[in-house]
């Protein structure tokens, strides 16, 4: 115990603001068009394993919810019309949070104290590992008045990870119904946000979380960084503005 106290005193405070830590150089974030004339070769569409790229004439759009940031499209584009950035602030609001009046009411009710119930409905655990980091001393989720709870009956926010499998469909529906209103649902990662990771049609999966329950916050990524998760939570609570 004495050695632990000595180490704590020597290291000092390690907790940082949600956006204070720099992203590593090798981090892969948002993929976006870089501009220029598309040759319509279709190489990027063929390279994308989740069908996140859509082409309309000469314009290319990337479905950020479905994108797993593998970078294959960037590598295959001979004209360099796609670029991969280090941007992780991809969270977007949906559902009831799109209405200003409803969002204001939810912010007043949950803005300073939010209890989260995590539900894995079929993930590879990568998103779950990132969630665990929120409870460590660096990101310290509790400094924002947010904490995880063991029961959906005590929760305000249902945080869903993984593509919804058929075997866990009932678990998702029952957990959602057990969460008291007003309640929010956050889809964490590309699997929960879009449900395309294992194909749009698959005998074992239902799709994304919004195929079964209304989703209010989407946090894309494969997996999303802890900062991306914090950005999504704080954005939903009205504590920060959309980047």
Short names for language-model regions:
Residues 131, 139, 145-228:
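Cofactor-cradling patches in redox/metallo enzymes
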């Amino acid at each position: 115990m004495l050695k632990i106290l000595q180490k704590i005193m020597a290291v000092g405070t390690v907790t940082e603001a949600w956006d204070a830590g720099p992203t590593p150089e090798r981090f892969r974030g948002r993929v976006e068009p870089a501009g220029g004339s598309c040759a319509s070769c279709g190489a990027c569409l063929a390279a994308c394993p989740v069908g996140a790229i859509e082409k309309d004439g000469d314009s290319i759009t990337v479905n950020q919810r479905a994108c797993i940031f593998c970078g294959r499209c960037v590598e295959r584009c001979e004209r360099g019309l796609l670029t991969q950035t280090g941007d992780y602030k991809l969270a977007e609001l949906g559902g009831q949070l799109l209405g200003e009046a409803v969002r204001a009411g939810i912010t007043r009710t949950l803005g300073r104290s939010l209890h989260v119930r995590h539900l894995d409905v079929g993930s590879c655990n990568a998103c779950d590992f990132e969630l665990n980091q929120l409870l460590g001393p660096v990101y310290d989720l509790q400094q924002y008045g947010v904490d995880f709870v063991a029961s959906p009956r005590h929760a305000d926010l249902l945080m869903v990870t993984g593509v919804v499998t058929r075997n866990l469909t009932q678990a998702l529906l029952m957990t959602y119904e057990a969460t008291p209103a007003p309640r929010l649902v956050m889809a964490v990662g590309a699997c929960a946000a879009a449900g395309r990771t294992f194909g749009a049609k698959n005998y074992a999966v239902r799709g994304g979380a919004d195929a079964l329950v209304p989703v209010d916050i989407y946090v894309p990524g494969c997996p999303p960084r802890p900062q991306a998760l914090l950005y999504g939570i704080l954005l939903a609570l009205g504590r920060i503005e959309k980047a």
